[in-house]
From Swiss-Prot:
GO CC aspect terms: DNA-directed RNA polymerase complex
Protein name: DNA-directed RNA polymerase subunit beta
Keyword Transcription: yes
HAMAP family: RNApol_bact_RpoB
Length: 1271
């Protein structure tokens, strides 16, 4: 039996049964949030400002430059921000430069841009006083994708391609029905592929055939193509984009160029360029083929014709790409380049990089030639042009006076591509025709698509028909990436800045430079709005699930495919939702919601990280070959899903000796997601841990490997619903992740520096760190650098205030987002030494720094009088008496006083409430606000408030009378804050905010008062309980202790569960847990049994034997009522059970009198509206079946929507009269009104009276004898 005792922090200790040789530490679990936001603040904001800078006015006179940005300090702390219902933010300012392009005059100033919400150290945002989390979004990466489908009509595989940017127009290629290839730009109508190729700059049919090779597909496409030149092709493409509109070729070319080659409209981002280069590399397709021509470099043959292109040959070619780079399109024909008439300077062959004027530049007023044709463009020439700018053609000025004039011509290049001619052998050994492979220029680094990329993507598309290249799996994690908080925020900033840029341009055009300053030109309202909308209402900005630390942590590590730019829930198919083999170690295959979001919302695996491109990577241990031996090193390598495909990866459970050598010569391993048996010398990497495949919540389920997947899913999800208990206890049977989960969640307090605890109480902990300098007090040396540092010295330093102590304020009785209690308790003692990173105070649902969601209770799997039928739970009254499952809940109630309309007076907080007795206001203080500590029940007044009834302007004498007598009953009505239906408890605290005190309140609000009521909820029948294996149930009976079964030693069972809940559910983990739990409890230890690497059956048997428990884990139980033993031995053990947030107190509801819906006049539904129970169609059938006619009529009329009838019945009951007959239900009247709306005249004639009953109403006298009964 192999185990080791492991300490978790300073306080917790467990017997660890894991078998892993190299234990790799978990990464910081919320780093995905914090690191991304830090990058955005440090570099992202400045990058965005640089992108929009400079902003030019429409007439080009003014230019606005954004320089570096800066952030102020937050105004309030995180706690203070929550109390005041504000945003935890810092003011973002930027240094701005406004330049007059004519005179060169510059004005600089610092401009406030927006309030930027800041991330707290625990990875959350505080918006309007509530903590929120921004969930990461998983989206399709930009890149080039190829797919195939079988056309059943012609029994042939058709390919299609998509060139997808991060932002901008899509390019698509596809095969039509008659073996004709088509292209589409920006989802427009399709054009023949050859038309699209011509538009790129290929002049003749011969050029195209020579470049891409001859094939029947290309020939068929030419027959469909009606264009004969690039100009015609561009015009045709433009007309498809603009629904048949016709323009000259230059205008069409410029329009398409702006769509594809303008960085502001088309953005591949860093990830898109990375994917383009990887996918469109000529060598990636060429591997495994044979060269059709010699590759010649500097006059020598680098690689000879007919060479088989193995990995080694490919590496040689990769280092000498110049040997097969060729220009396909000249710079004059390249679609990417600006049209010739817009290019006013050019390079000359003899002039190197110097620019020369293409035409004379003339002063339009005087006719003087300022720059002659072919004159070099020097700084003196540019200065002369600036002086005469008002006398020169505007187009000329804009061209020459832009700062990148020298770049403009250098960007006018031909299209360079990397080209190889190859051939392959088919299955019969026959040699194929020569296949032309064109790859993109691997030196390309621009963030928009280049013509060489488009040419390469077309070549790849055609190569697929030749059997070269691979189609893509869009669900593979190599093709899906994460947008983290930094990128999501950057996108919102970009939208806000783009709108602000438009406003600024408009303002600049109407502003005289003499009056212009950066401050009055800039209007950043759109930016403020974009950020506010994102944090307030985006699908990815979620109200934080703060019910327990695990729920917090899981939400921060959640990955959603929904939201802007993602997938719509109702359009998502099975493939997107399904588990993919590339999820291994990246996304948890188990933790996902049940219901419509299944598979669209996932959770990051325990060890997963995110790379610079947004791809999820997971760690592996490097495996090396030492001669004939294969050993696993301690070196950790992180691989993305794409990179992993090159490796053969052994399972973490592979047997090894103590030196890390594989014991067996054949090993189970994965390659490309497929599991097989490989020779040990083929292995290149190994999983770091068995738990790397699952998420944090899933990895906290012991014996996960023995549970059915759907039950494990429920177990992982239900742990997040655990209510923090009054006395939390960490599990006896844990998995070892409890400590890290609690530590990284942000719920506990962690020491920043090492030192001695010199002061501790319930509200704060003070730690005195070891000084870095010698400390003296007068002539006495208190501490000498390098000398001894103990508690005595630390205490003196603290008392004399000689060093800067670390003070940690603990959160006391704070309300969470889910109305549960947040309370931090110190777990260190005065005089104790703590290291940096140690947990020094527990939070909710933690014990000694470990996650503690529930309690360890004695469980028996047995039935008891049928009370645990259908998963119901029977519980001992002992658990109620000893507050084992008691939790504290805090409700917040708020009231405001406002100024009313003119002459209506204002609302007041007061103790003098009209028509209310002294008993009702006995707990209010002199202001009229409840005193903390008071016990209140529903209907009690919390804050006395009166509101003026109507318009009045009291005379001076009336004011005097009011002042003396204080009689407010006549003019004021009671609008006090009362405890609502179902509320009550002890008033825990009161917060008072007032404009007079300088508090920030909404417009029109004078005072704001919040009352917090705490309530202790003991567990009761109807509450939901669960284990960690998806074994959930509702408490059906709480039995007195004396009726509960007991063991031979007198131990009473705490909970009885139904044994029938186990076999069909296949969650056997709970059975193993109870046996290990009771064994560990008897031995006085706690156990860590990690998932897939925990206690084996043999080890469990040995532990049970050590604890003196029968091998089958069963024992004789005695009936508490009779003292007789039960006929059969019963499985009894210790299980970790949690109380879930689905409590009966929140759900049970009864209606006496309540509101009715406006149109149908039927009772409202739901607890929140104090609604009734719907008597539905099936319930009506039940009354039909019994023939209960009168009851049925009552249900459908006076108890539902018969307005006249119910008022008459009320009158009859209060006056002791007979119950009258029902009249017409309101829903019938609604039907008649709807028919009338269609132009039909509807009457319901009473046969006896001859009256139209359908038009009777409450508001006229048509209901005889009814009005006298109205109140």
């Amino acid at each position: 039996m192999s185990y080791k005792t492991v300490k978790y922090g300073k306080k917790a200790e467990r017997r660890d049964y894991s078998k892993m040789l190299h234990q790799v530490e978990l990464p910081n679990l919320i780093e995905i949030q914090t690191k991304s936001f830090e990058e955005f603040v440090e570099t992202g904001i400045d990058e965005l400002l640089k992108d929009i800078s400079p902003i030019e006015g429409h007439n080009g006179d003014l230019k606005l430059y954004f320089e570096e940005s800066s952030l102020s300090e937050p105004k309030y702390s995180t706690i203070e921000t929550k109390i005041r219902d504000l945003n935890y933010s810092r003011q973002l300012s930027a240094r701005v430069k406004l330049e007059n392009a004519i005179t060169g005059e510059v004005r600089e100033s610092t401009v406030l841009m927006t309030d930027l919400p800041m991330m707290t150290p625990s990875g959350t945002f505080i918006i309007n006083g509530a903590e929120r989390v921004v969930v990461s979004q998983i989206v399709r990466s930009s890149g080039v994708y190829y797919t195939s489908e079988l056309d059943k009509k012609i029994n042939q595989i058709k390919y299609s391609a998509q060139v997808i940017p991060t932002r901008g127009a899509w390019i698509e290629f596809e095969q039509g029905s008659k073996e004709i290839l088509y292209a589409k730009l920006d989802r427009s109508k399709k054009v023949p592929l050859t038309t699209f190729i011509r538009a790129l700059g290929f002049t003749t049919k011969k050029d195209i055939e020579e470049t891409f090779g001859r094939s029947s597909l290309i020939t068929n496409t030419f027959e469909k193509d009606e264009t004969k030149s690039p100009n015609e092709a561009v015009i045709d493409l433009y007309s498809k984009l603009r629904q048949g509109e016709k323009v000259p070729a230059d205008a069409a070319r410029e329009f398409i160029r702006m769509r594809l080659f303008d960085a502001r409209r088309y953005d591949l981002a860093k990830v898109g360029r990375y994917k383009f280069i990887k996918k469109l590399d000529v060598l990636a397709r060429a591997e495994g083929t044979y060269l059709a021509n010699d590759i010649i470099l500097d006059g020598e043959v680098l690689v000879a014709k007919d060479t088989h292109l193995t990995k080694e040959v490919i590496q040689i070619l990769a280092q000498n790409r110049d040997a097969f780079r060729k220009q396909l399109i000249t710079k004059e024909n390249n679609l990417q380049n600006e049209t010739a008439d817009e290019i006013l300077a050019t390079t000359l062959p003899e002039g190197g990089n110097t620019l020369y004027a293409k035409e004379n530049v003339v002063n339009l007023k005087t006719g003087e030639v300022l720059v002659k044709k072919n004159e070099a463009i020097t700084e003196e020439v540019l200065t002369n042009l600036r002086k005469n700018r008002h006398s020169i053609d505007e187009k000329v000025i804009k061209y020459f006076l832009t700062e990148d004039v020298y770049k403009k011509e250098s960007l006018r290049q031909g299209v360079i591509s990397e080209i190889l001619d190859v051939y392959v052998y088919d299955d019969a050994g026959d040699k194929s025709n020569v296949i032309r492979i064109i790859g993109s220029d691997q030196r390309e680094d621009r963030i928009f698509v280049a013509v060489s990329d488009i040419v390469a993507s077309i070549s790849y598309f055609l190569n697929l028909y030749d059997g070269l290249g691979n189609v893509d799996d869009i669900d593979h994690l190599g093709n899906r990436r994460l947008r983290l908080i930094g990128e999501l925020l950057k996108n919102q900033f970009r939208i806000g800045l783009a709108r602000a840029e438009k406003n600024i341009k408009d303002k600049m055009s109407t502003t005289n430079f003499n009056d212009a300053t950066p401050a009055n030109v800039i209007n950043m309202t759109p930016l403020v709005g974009a950020i506010k909308t994102f944090f307030g209402s985006s699908q990815l900005s979620q109200f934080m699930d703060q019910i327990n630390p695990l729920a917090e942590l899981t939400q921060k590590r959640r990955v959603s495919a929904l939201g802007t730019g993602g997938i719509a829930r109702d359009r998502a198919g099975v493939e997107v939702r399904d588990v993919h083999n590339s999820h291994y170690g990246r996304l948890c295959p188990i933790e996902t919601p049940e219901g419509p979001s299944i598979g669209l919302i996932s959770s990051l695996a325990t060890y997963a990280k995110v790379d610079e491109y947004g791809f999820i990577k997971t760690p592996f241990l490097k495996v090396v070959q030492n001669g004939n031996e294969t050993s696993v090193t301690k070196e950790v390598i992180y691989l993305t899903a794409d990179e992993e495909s090159d490796h053969v990866i052994a399972s973490a459970a592979t047997p090894m000796d103590e030196h890390g050598l594989f014991i067996e010569s054949r090993v189970i391993a994965r390659r490309n997601g497929e599991t097989g048996i490989y020779d040990a010398n083929e292995i290149t990497a190994m999983d770091v841990s068995p738990k790397q495949v699952v998420s944090v919540a899933t990895s906290s389920i012991p014996f996960l490997e023995h549970d059915d997947a759907s039950r494990a899913l429920m177990g992982a999800n239900m742990q997040r619903q655990a209510v923090p208990l009054l006395q939390p206890t960490s599990p006896i049977v844990g998995t070892g992740v409890e400590y890290r989960a609690a530590k990284d969640s942000g719920a506990v307090v962690i020491a920043k520096n090492s030192g001695y605890v010199t002061y501790v109480d319930g509200k704060k902990i003070i730690i005195t760190p070891e000084p870095t300098d010698t400390i003296k007090s007068g002539s006495k040396t208190l501490y000498k650098v390098g000398g001894e540092f103990d508690y005595g010295i630390a205490k003196k330093l603290y008392e004399t205030k000689s060093v800067q102590n670390d003070q940690y304020d603990l959160v006391q009785f704070f309300r969470s987002n889910q109305d549960t209690l947040i309370l931090q308790k110190p777990i260190v003692m005065q005089g104790e030494y703590v290291d940096a990173g140690d947990v020094i105070a527990d939070g909710p649902s933690t014990e000694n720094g470990e996650l503690a969601l529930g309690r360890n209770v004695t469980v028996a799997f047995m039935t008891w009088e049928g009370y645990n039928y259908e998963d119901a739970v029977i519980m001992s009254e002992d658990l109620v008496k000893h507050d084992v499952y008691t939790s504290i809940h805090i409700d917040e109630y708020e009231i405001e006083t406002r100024d009313l309309k003119q002459a209506n007076g204002k609302e007041e907080i007061t103790r003098e409430i009209p028509n209310v007795g002294q008993e009702a206001i006995k707990f209010l203080d002199e202001r009229g606000i409840i005193v903390p500590g008071s016990e209140v029940k529903e209907g009690d007044i919390l804050v006395g408030k009166i509101t003026p009834k109507g318009v009045f302007e009291p005379t001076p004498s009336e004011k005097l009378i009011h002042a003396v007598i204080g009689d407010k009953a006549k003019e004021y009505r009671d609008s006090s804050l009362r405890v609502p239906h179902g509320g009550g408890g002890v008033v825990q605290s009161v917060q008072y905010f007032s404009k007079k005190n300088g508090d920030q309140l909404p417009t029109g609000v004078n005072e704001q008062i919040r009352v917090y009521i705490a309530k202790k909820r003991k567990i009761t029948e109807g509450d939901k309980m669960a284990g960690r294996h998806g074994n959930k149930g509702v408490i059906s009976k709480i039995l007195p202790r004396e009726d509960m079964p007991y063991l031979a030693d007198g131990t009473y069972v705490d909970i009885m569960l139904n044994p029938l809940g186990v076999p069909s559910r296949m969650n056997i983990g709970q059975i193993l847990e109870i046996h290990l739990g009771i064994s560990a409890q008897k031995l006085g230890i706690k156990v860590a049994s990690p998932v897939f690497d925990g206690v084996t059956n043999d080890e469990l048997g040995a532990i049970m034997e050590e604890a003196g428990i029968a091998p089958d884990g069963k024992t004789t139980l005695y009936d508490g009522r009779t003292g007789e033993p039960y006929n059969n031995r019963i499985s009894v053990g210790v299980m970790y059970m949690i109380k879930l947030s689905h409590m009966v107190d929140d759900k049970l509801h009864a209606r006496n009198v309540g509101p009715y819906t406006l149109v149908t006049q039927q009772p409202m539904g739901g607890k929140a509206q104090n609604g009734g129970q719907r008597f539905g169609e099936m319930e009506v059938w039940a009354l039909y079946a019994y023939g209960a006619a009168h009851t049925l009529q009552e249900m459908l009329t006076i108890k539902s929507d018969d307005m006249i009838g119910r008022n008459k019945v009320y009158y009859a009951i209060t006056h002791g009269q007979e119950i009258p007959k029902a009249s017409i239900p309101e829903s019938f009247r609604v039907l008649t009104r709807e028919l009338q709306a269609l132009g039909l005249y509807v009457e319901l004639i009473d046969a006896n009276k001859g009256e139209n009953e359908a038009i009777k109403s409450l508001v006229d006298n048509s209901s005889k004898g009814f009005n006298k009964g109205r109140f």
